[in-house]
């Protein structure tokens, strides 16, 4: 649910000239084209012409920054001048407000900006003053000496088009024009003598107006914006936003609840039930479903319509005031000043009620049909459809497993949000709420947060605490959060509370309707108001401008309420030396190189409504003197109002912190003569700080005489506090809402900040922060449990790719995604780099150009040229018969359909071209609603990725063949040249992954698909994907491997992959150059068509050089083959011809009835060994469904002599080891194997038992086991008796996440042949925990991932994962203490007996990914510090404190853990 504030602050300018836009510590004042690229509706690298009605792209910009234009407007400059916060938000979310949205044209229109202080302006003087030549960015020549070009954004009538106004070559400054008494940015300006005159006097060229409408998504590629997408009609490019990225393919579902106009200080209103965003878009044209764009009755007033319709209301152009007038003696009431009010906590409360099953809004929050929302703006007001309630009962019918999330978009200062159950200030009752909500007590929740933050009593700047209220940001004792309101320093009298955090905490600890807790993500828009931090020595002093109205319009200076002035504009005159001598703003000629700032603040004299314009201007001059003191001087410059205003600041970080009201406002039309006679009046007031008096001095009875007024100029000198400020500011409520709004606890990102709090300080980062929020939300669901890391030894180019999947619409739609994450220097997952779905071609022409190949039968070197084809309909005909119907039947038959079946499923008019184009990604035959057209509607371009694990081809890859002495010298030498050429090239790196859309996909390192291959083994049922009643099938679901190999006289990069559960097939592709992949690069495909021993190959294949000089692919035959045997395949890598098959027969009849789930056998995962160091394979270990661990001997050059290594006295093959449970029943082995050198000789093989692919496997409670088996080269191991046991025990104290103890019994290899760990907690019954992943060896430790299926009560796919870290030699605990960076700063869990940690997640983890930071790169803490883990010592990993490793959890990358490791070369040897 998108929860969105909609108050007036959204309509201020995006670039206010008083923000640090690029994070360099320096305020970015004015336009910085060489430093910053400004975000907005215009293409920053394009030149625009103004044609009188709109801006149009005309040419590519030039110059070294790519932004300069001659005689035209630079798009980047227009973004800087014209973008409002609302414009930026609209563009981020859905591409912008489309005023025109036709098939051939899109025109975006800027947000309405009334002619008051919401309007803004910029100015230009000269190259020497501003740093750029205006003629490079606008069709203007330089102004004359002492003159300025002024720019303003405003709207000149209530229904008018927003305008960019240009007042050229004038002597006036920008504040003389846009900060004048109403109307602003009009025809009048004020002079330095405070006189109102015509702006066109004094040599001005006059005012020119430019309507703020822009035509976007040009047909010219070089002019088109990067967010324009080509839709299927092949003519419409449309601007898109992040809702398109995450919602158009239904990866996420969105609803919208916002504040309302009618109830502006109460509650919130649902405008869109949670639904698919794609319903708001015409899938063929990309038009929004508004104004008849989706046919009769097809309009959808959803998220786009609502946010596009939002605007400022109630501004009257007759007198330039708001309808509520001047409210000066009390806070605003309901229905007054519609644009003010942001009750965020109450909106969040409504959202919890919605998730919890409520069927209607709270009456206190609801609006009626005569409201401004409905009657004026025509906003939608739908009936509530609770997401987890079934459709037949009026709900949306979503799965209880779907993760409910609130994403809150709001200014950091909520207001008036105290009308909630349990509120300190109201008797609001939740008795009628859903059952899950009835225990909500916001005061109790808020106080729990206070205690979690340390509790006690502290001094904070706040408007009210524990009934102590002065409506000012004065220091007050705070002892809880439940009685705090009046957010400071900006809005101490507007009733903003911390109840939003309380509501979030309640949702994170209570399940609302579904089976999961509600998670809160906050996109916090920084206040548009200024806050200045001054470096003073080694400390920082914070200063925020502040003013109060004290007399006029009935205000009583001694009453309970005096309006806090709104800061409605500010102008930085000069700022320097704020970032030290190396900073970009350093200037030794200004204040001796010490910090200096000079700025003007414009104050409005009431808190809301009125005329919302400048009523007083104060000039602030602040600098650090030679004594390292902060000097603050204020001067009253201008006034135009009938209310007396006292102006000052709130300061902290000094020895005299507090609220200072220092100066008066001037009498209207008077200039400042330095005496009190120029003031509007002299008013006694409790917050006054007369010269030489401190805060609180005037708050006395009787009031001292010198408190009777203030001067128009004041200077004060501050010293820095040696122990920090006495009083400080609380963080904003949204920060606490994020911190306590996640059911997994406090979640930190890799930089140590909250992973679900996204502050937006300026528009440049708005899209980035929203993308991070949505990415974090999307990563919660559907992980396939696998991961691939590019650059596990962390460098600047390291990244990880994680596949995921989702299922919707009763299992008729299964979509996949692969997300690439940056890996930060500390090894943790960082920002999202790209999404693979965005890189799959879309649009008819692009889909037609997709590079997709298939094979009409099995493939080898004898038939490759004839059977490998492009995957298009005409190529699926073996040879044309000349008869259309016959050829069509042949194509349909290859895809699994008879002509009758086509008619039954799709109708009689469907052609082979249409079906094949659909499978290539064409959506034109899908309906606008689910399954109303011939083909099934898909909500993403990729199929689900469940068992497939991505493999990565990197430029840095080096497989070591240059040092393989068993290879001929010419091959070794040429390999060195081959890898050097690759490493020095600029070629892209590539990621290969199979998906259940029937394809093996190849993506480059930017996420763009380069080619895809449809194996013949899945071709015969590929057409089923189009069936509207589709039930899930596996297709390309197997594992792949990648290596360099010497084929036909040259080195090539080869991928060998399998279809896994999707079919009985293995294939090999030459991927040396993925960008030029063609038919000849399909080397071979072997399937059950040409070999009855081929089964469903679930194991990973290997690419190896053999001792007979051949290169081969080696793999187990998989499961459920026709013959039902366990067979090792050795296939010529270049030709696909079979070199040798070796059956591993254990004497169990496949048709027999062995008690341990025997049935048919099959060989799964392997481990290959080079025992003599020559680079050639000598041995292979493999495991099967009968629990056998086999050893195959491949030594020697004669393939006929290769076979099973161990045999009985009769010459029958026997396994090295048979895995059995304590009762003697065999344990199937389907996970991977890992091998290390043994204690004195031989090898240790690591694996686990368990199965998770057959029917009823989910329900099995059979005991599985982790093993470390020593193959000493002598007699076969005689079962468990020959092994040492380690025991799992429950942790003796609770931790988060959960941990387990594993014993550390000593092991002597003189008497034992390894160890085992039964996957059952001592004293408990087996829960079905099993090992189906591949172990990972690192530094003397072995990492096992295990899975416990079906533990979720409500979600059939539920389960949990555990990570075991065991000593490789003994199997004892070796996890020790670990750092959990995502759960709190420096938190650690575990001790020397800890052997396992819960890693959560619903999907079984199939691979353990690890990154390693380089020595002396950042780690999360320093060993020995409080809460920082020590390095666990293991068999051969001595204590060291410089390096760390991170274990990445593919189910939830934000929950990955870090632990320290020994640096440098390890004595423990492992084989790769």
From Swiss-Prot:
Upregulation: Expression is not affected by calcium.
Pfam families, per the entry: T4P_PilY1 (PF05567)
InterPro entries linked: PilY1_beta_prop_dom, Quinoprotein_ADH-like_sf
Biased composition regions of type Polar residues, renumbered to the chain: 1383-1397
Chief location: other
Compartment list: Fimbrium
N-terminal signal peptide: none
Disruption phenotype: Shows twitching motility. Loss of increased twitching motility at higher Ca(2+) concentrations. Forms T4P. Impaired in the calcium-mediated increase in single-cell attachment to surfaces, but biofilm formation is not affected.
Cysteine-cysteine disulfides: none
GO cellular component, one term: type IV pilus
Keyword tRNA processing: no
Keyword annotations: Calcium, Fimbrium, Fimbrium biogenesis, Metal-binding
Family: Belongs to the PilY1 family.
Function: One of the three PilY1 homologs of X.fastidiosa, which are involved in bacterial twitching motility as component of the filamentous type IV pili (T4P). The twitching motility of this protein is enhanced by calcium, which may provide the bacterium an adaptive advantage in environments with high calcium concentrations.
Name of the featured protein: Type IV pilus biogenesis factor PilY1 homolog PD_1611
UniProt lineage: Bacteria, Pseudomonadati, Pseudomonadota, Gammaproteobacteria, Lysobacterales
Gene name of this polypeptide: pilY1_1
């Amino acid at each position: 649910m998108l929860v969105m504030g909609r108050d007036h602050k959204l309509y201020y300018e995006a670039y206010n000239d008083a923000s640090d836009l690029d994070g360099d510590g320096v305020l970015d004042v004015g336009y910085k084209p060489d430093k910053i690229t400004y975000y907005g509706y215009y293409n920053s690298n394009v030149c625009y012409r103004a044609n009188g009605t709109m801006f149009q792209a005309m040419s590519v910009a030039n110059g070294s920054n790519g932004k300069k234009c001659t005689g035209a407007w630079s798009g980047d400059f227009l973004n800087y001048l014209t973008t409002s916060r609302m414009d930026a938000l609209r563009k981020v979310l859905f591409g912008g407000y489309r005023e025109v949205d036709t098939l051939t044209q899109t025109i975006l229109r800027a947000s309405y900006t009334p002619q008051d202080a919401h309007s803004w302006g910029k100015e230009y003087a000269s190259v020497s003053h501003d740093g750029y030549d205006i003629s490079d960015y606008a069709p203007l020549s330089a102004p004359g000496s002492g003159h300025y070009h002024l720019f303003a954004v405003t709207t000149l009538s209530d229904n008018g088009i927003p305008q960019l106004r240009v007042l050229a070559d004038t002597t006036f400054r920008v504040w003389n024009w846009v900060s004048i008494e109403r109307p602003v940015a009009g025809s009048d300006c004020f002079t330095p003598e405070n006189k109102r005159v015509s702006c066109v006097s004094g040599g001005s060229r006059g005012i020119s107006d430019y309507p703020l409408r822009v035509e976007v998504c040009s047909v010219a590629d070089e002019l088109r914006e990067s967010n324009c997408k080509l839709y299927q009609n092949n003519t419409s490019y449309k601007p898109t936003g992040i809702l398109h990225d995450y919602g158009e393919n239904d990866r996420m579902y969105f609803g919208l609840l916002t504040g309302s106009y009618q109830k502006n200080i109460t509650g919130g209103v649902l405008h869109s039930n949670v639904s698919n965003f794609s319903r708001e878009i015409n899938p063929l044209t990309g038009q929004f479903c508004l104004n008849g764009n989706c046919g009769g009755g097809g309009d959808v007033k959803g998220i786009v319509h609502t946010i596009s319709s939002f605007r400022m209301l109630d501004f009257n152009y007759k007198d330039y005031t708001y309808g509520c007038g001047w409210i000066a003696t009390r806070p605003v009431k309901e229905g007054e000043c519609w644009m003010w009010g942001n009750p965020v906590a109450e909106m969040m409360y409504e959202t919890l009620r919605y998730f919890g099953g409520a069927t209607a809004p709270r009456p206190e929050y609801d609006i009626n049909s005569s409201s401004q929302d409905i009657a004026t703006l025509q906003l939608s007001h739908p009936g509530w459809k609770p997401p987890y309630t079934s459709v037949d009962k009026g709900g949306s019918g979503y799965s209880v497993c779907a993760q409910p999330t609130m994403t809150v978009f709001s200014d950091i200062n909520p207001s008036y949000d105290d009308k909630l159950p349990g509120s300190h200030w109201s008797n609001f009752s939740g008795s009628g709420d859903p059952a899950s909500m009835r225990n909500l007590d916001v005061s109790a929740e808020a106080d729990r947060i206070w205690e979690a933050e340390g509790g006690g009593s502290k001094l904070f700047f706040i408007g009210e605490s524990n009934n102590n209220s002065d409506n000012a940001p004065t220091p007050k004792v705070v002892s809880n959060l439940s009685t705090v309101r009046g957010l400071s320093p900006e809005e101490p009298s507007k009733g903003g509370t911390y109840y939003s955090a309380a509501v979030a905490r309640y949702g994170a600890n209570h399940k609302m309707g579904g089976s999961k807790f509600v998670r809160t993500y906050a996109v916090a828009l920084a206040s548009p108001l200024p806050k200045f931090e001054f470096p003073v020595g080694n400390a920082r002093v914070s200063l925020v401008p502040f003013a109060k109205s004290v007399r006029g319009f009935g205000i009583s200076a001694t009453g309970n309420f005096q309006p806090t002035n709104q800061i409605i504009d500010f102008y930085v005159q000069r700022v320097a030396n704020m970032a030290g001598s190396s900073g970009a703003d350093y200037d030794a000629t200004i204040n001796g190189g010490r910090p200096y700032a000079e700025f003007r603040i414009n104050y409005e004299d009431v808190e809301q409504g009125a005329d919302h314009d400048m009523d007083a201007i104060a000039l602030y001059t602040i600098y650090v003197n030679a004594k390292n003191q902060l000097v603050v001087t204020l001067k009253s410059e201008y006034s135009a109002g009938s209310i007396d205003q006292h102006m000052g600041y709130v300061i902290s970080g000094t020895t005299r912190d507090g609220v200072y009201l220092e100066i008066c406002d001037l009498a209207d039309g008077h200039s400042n003569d330095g005496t009190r006679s120029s003031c509007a009046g002299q008013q006694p007031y409790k917050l006054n700080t007369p010269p030489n008096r401190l805060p609180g001095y005037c708050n006395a009875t009787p009031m001292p005489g010198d408190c009777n007024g203030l001067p128009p100029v004041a200077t004060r000198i501050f010293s820095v506090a040696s122990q920090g400020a006495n009083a400080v500011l609380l963080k904003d409520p949204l920060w606490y809402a994020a911190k306590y709004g996640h059911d997994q606890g406090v979640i930190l990102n890799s930089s140590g900040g909250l992973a679900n709090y996204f502050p937006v300080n300026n528009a440049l980062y708005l899209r980035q922060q929203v993308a991070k929020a949505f990415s974090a939300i999307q990563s919660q669901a559907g992980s396939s449990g696998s991961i691939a890391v590019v650059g596990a030894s962390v460098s600047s180019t390291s990244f990880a790719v994680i596949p995921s999947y989702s299922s919707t619409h009763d299992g008729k739609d299964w979509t996949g995604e692969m997300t690439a994450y940056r890996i930060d220097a500390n090894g943790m997952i960082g920002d999202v780099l790209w999404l693979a779905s965005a890189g799959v071609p879309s649009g008819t022409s692009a889909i037609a150009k997709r590079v997709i190949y298939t094979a009409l039968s099995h493939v080898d070197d004898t038939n490759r040229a004839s059977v490998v084809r492009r995957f298009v309909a005409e190529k699926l005909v073996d040879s044309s018969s000349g008869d259309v119907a016959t050829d069509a039947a042949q194509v349909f038959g290859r895809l699994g359909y008879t002509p009758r079946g086509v008619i039954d499923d799709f109708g009689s008019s469907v052609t082979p071209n249409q079906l094949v184009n659909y499978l290539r990604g064409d959506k034109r035959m899908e309906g606008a609603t689910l399954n109303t057209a011939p083909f099934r509607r898909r909500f993403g371009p990729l199929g689900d990725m469940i068992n497939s694990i991505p493999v990565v081809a990197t430029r840095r890859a080096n497989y070591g063949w240059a040092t393989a002495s068993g290879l001929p010298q010419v091959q070794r030498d040429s390999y060195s040249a081959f890898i050097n050429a690759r490493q020095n090239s600029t070629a892209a790196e590539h990621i290969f992954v199979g998906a259940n859309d029937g394809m093996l996909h190849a993506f480059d390192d930017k996420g763009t698909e380069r080619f895809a291959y449809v194996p013949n083994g899945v071709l015969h049922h590929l057409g089923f994907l189009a069936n509207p009643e589709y039930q899930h099938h596996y297709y390309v679901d197997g594992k792949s491997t990648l290596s360099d190999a010497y084929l036909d006289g040259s080195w090539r990069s080869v991928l060998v992959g399998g279809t896994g559960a999707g079919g009985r097939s293995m294939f090999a592709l030459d991927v040396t150059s993925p960008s030029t992949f063609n038919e000849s690069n399909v080397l071979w495909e072997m399937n059950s068509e040409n070999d009855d021993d081929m089964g469903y190959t679930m194991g990973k294949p290997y690419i190896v050089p053999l001792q007979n000089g051949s290169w081969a692919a080696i793999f187990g035959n998989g499961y459920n083959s026709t013959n039902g045997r366990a067979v090792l395949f050795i296939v010529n890598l270049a030709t696909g011809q079979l070199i040798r098959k070796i059956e591993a027969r254990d004497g169990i009849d496949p048709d027999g009835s062995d008690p341990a789930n025997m049935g048919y056998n099959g060989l799964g995962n392997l481990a290959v060994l080079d025992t003599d160091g020559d680079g050639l394979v000598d041995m292979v270990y493999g495991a099967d469904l009968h629990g056998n661990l086999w050893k195959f001997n491949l030594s020697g050059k004669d393939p006929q002599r290769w076979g099973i290594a161990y045999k009985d006295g009769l010459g029958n093959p026997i396994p090295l080891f048979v895995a059995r449970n304590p009762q003697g029943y065999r344990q199937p082995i389907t996970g991977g194997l890992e091998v290390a050198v043994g204690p004195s000789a031989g090898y240790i093989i690591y694996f686990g038992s368990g199965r998770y692919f057959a029917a009823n496997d989910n329900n099995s409670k059979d005991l599985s086991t982790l093993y470390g088996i020593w193959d000493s080269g002598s007699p076969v191991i005689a079962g468990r008796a020959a092994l040492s046991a380690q025991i799992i025990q429950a942790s003796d104290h609770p931790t988060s996440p959960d941990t387990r103890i594993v014993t550390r019994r000593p092991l002597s290899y003189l008497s034992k042949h390894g160890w085992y760990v039964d996957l059952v907690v001592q004293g408990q019954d087996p829960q079905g925990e099993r090992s189906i992943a591949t172990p990972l060896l690192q530094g003397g430790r072995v990492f096992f991932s295990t899975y416990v299926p079906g533990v979720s009560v409500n979600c059939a796919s539920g389960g949990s994962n555990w990570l075991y870290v065991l000593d490789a030699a003994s199997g004892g605990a070796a996890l020790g203490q670990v750092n959990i960076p995502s759960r709190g700063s420096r938190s650690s869990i575990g001790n020397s007996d800890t052997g396992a940690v819960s890693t959560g997640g619903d999907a079984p983890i199939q691979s353990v990914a690890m990154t390693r930071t380089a020595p002396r790169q950042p780690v999360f803490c320093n060993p020995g510090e409080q809460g920082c883990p020590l390095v666990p010592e293991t068999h051969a990993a001595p204590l060291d404190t410089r390096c760390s490793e991170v274990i990445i959890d593919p189910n939830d990358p934000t929950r990955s853990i870090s632990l320290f490791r020994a640096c440098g070369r390890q004595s423990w040897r492992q084989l790769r």
